[in-house]
Curated annotation (Swiss-Prot):
Coiled-coil blocks: none
Sequence positions that bind Ca(2+) 1: 464, 466, 468, 470, 475
Name this protein carries in UniProt: Calcium-dependent protein kinase 27
InterPro entries reported in the protein's UniProt record: CDPK_Ser/Thr_kinases (IPR050205), EF-hand-dom_pair (IPR011992), EF_Hand_1_Ca_BS (IPR018247), EF_hand_dom (IPR002048), Kinase-like_dom_sf (IPR011009), Prot_kinase_dom (IPR000719), Protein_kinase_ATP_BS (IPR017441), Ser/Thr_kinase_AS (IPR008271)
Protein origin, superkingdom: Eukaryota
Protein kinase domain span: 150-408
The reaction(s) this protein catalyses: L-seryl-[protein] + ATP = O-phospho-L-seryl-[protein] + ADP + H(+); L-threonyl-[protein] + ATP = O-phospho-L-threonyl-[protein] + ADP + H(+)
Gene Ontology MF annotations: ATP binding; calcium ion binding; calcium-dependent protein serine/threonine kinase activity; calcium/calmodulin-dependent protein kinase activity; calmodulin binding; protein serine kinase activity
The record's note on its domains: There are 3 contiguous domains conserved in the CDPK subfamily: a kinase domain, an autoinhibitory (junction) domain and a calmodulin-like domain. The autoinhibitory domain (414-444) inactivates kinase activity under calcium-free conditions.
Biological source species: Oryza sativa subsp. japonica (Rice)
Amino acid sequence: MGNVCIGPRRNFAKNGLLGILRPRHAAPSSPSQPTTTSRSIPVVLPSAPSSKPPPPTQTAPPVPVVISEPPPPQPQPEPQPAAPSQPPPPQEQPSPPPPASSNTTQQPPPPQQRQQSRAKKPAHIKRISSAGLQVESVLRRKTENLKDKYSLGRKLGQGQFGTTYLCVDKANGGEYACKSIAKRKLLTDEDVEDVRREIQIMHHLAGHPNIISIRGAYEDAVAVHVVMELCAGGELFDRIVRKGHYTERQAAGLARVIVAVVESCHSLGVMHRDLKPENFLFVGNEEDAPLKTIDFGLSMFFRPGEVFTDVVGSPYYVAPEVLKKSYGQEADVWSAGVIIYILLCGVPPFWAETEQGIFEQVLHGTLDFESDPWPNVSDGAKDLLRKVLVRDPKKRLTAHEVLCHPWLQMSGSAPDKPLDSAVLSRLRQFSAMNKLKKMALRVIAENLSEEEIAGLKEMFKMMDTDNSGQINYEELKAGLERVGANMKESEIYQLMQAADIDNSGTIDYGEFIAATLHLNKVEREDHLYAAFQYFDKDGSGYITSDELQQACDEFGIEDVRLEDMIGEVDQDNDGRIDYNEFVAMMQKTTTGFGKKGGHNFSGFRDALKSHS
């Protein structure tokens, strides 16, 4: 479930508003992990404000924005206090009660405006009067018992829907974080679907160095447990509070990480929708510790051109088009721009005493580049912010264009242009694999859970425009173009041939999943062993040429040289493949043909991530 979302409240809790509203001398919070709190309710805005509010540095009060649950009552204008020339001293106040949730739909429509309608009650959910929903199964599959594999330790964080604990792997002593979501608190069908989608998205984004990695999801009668990477270094939020603001070089380095995450999400068809400093954690306490993005509770799968209407996010970071209830993935870029602004000066670009005032400033306020420390900030940084914090999303830079901006290249470590998309990179690596490895990935893909491949399923449907269950050359070409992957026709043809394992001339669903699967899946011993057993038909512990021929027949692969296939993997030259040789082949890093950019993503999948 998501963190804190826009809603009718007066309290300014740390998780809901910028940490700048806390005193800069305040002690940083303890190391945190993603928690589960409330979702959003609609924000009702006047169709036309009576007058344009002054910039934050002026003293005239902002025109209030009315926040109410629909149908909205007729608002009575209330005078607002005059905005001070600088943000007021921060105050910690209790977190607000959770607002009512907005509706979402699981199946995305064609690239048109998404209608928010209440989903029908699934058959596996029973409604009871005293406890909202009685959920029989959230994950819709039987899972292992969490406590058979992990020991739960101290509490790391608390949210509206659940609690995050330290957990230890009983097998190897590794430390992780476990977010336990209480099923009794999932009051609506949408709450249940949101939990499923968050897990699906975490699996879909797996492997990115700056996105928190998921270890697995478990379910018992009481809760859904999500085990993930432990980030013990605390929030980016707290470091901003501690520092006041970063040096320009430090800010550029963090900005690159944040925007690269946004670009990767967009290229894989995911919109985060709640980017803010609280949702970035450091792995450790070191100054140069890696930064990880967390909390995908408000995130959605999207298709190019799709329009969303539900108002979600956090007040200081929400894009103006979100408040106007018509937005797409460009809203994430606005939120990233707000974070960059804060990194450079320590205060948000649009602020006021109340949420109503904040929303009005987001819609109509003026960027302040006059107050300290802006006279000492480079023109390049200000140029980037002017191009990111532009209210017309069509004129706003994309995440890819932000990464290519000269200011983010000032340290010399910016990515080369053009960047590969996440999917294009995976496609290219897949194309360079030997046939045995491709077949093994197909076996692994067919045994993955629904939540692990849900994102890839959405991408397949996006590319399969005629709903035939097959992607032909023209559909692959159009799909790559939609996500900004500019490729020569010869390259696309090579990718097509590489993914088409059975040489049918098209890419079917199973071939697409295998080719776009992130290779972190092959790190799991159970996946590797299951794949090896598929080829080792007689259970002898070896894959022989006869067994390999049988597997090729099952996959419809003809004209193969079995000796060459075995020879590529057979390290001891005994004419067969044992389990250790098989694992070495599967875990060997593969470099795709003509690979550009610095991505370490794998296979066919990265073909869809170039210019978001």
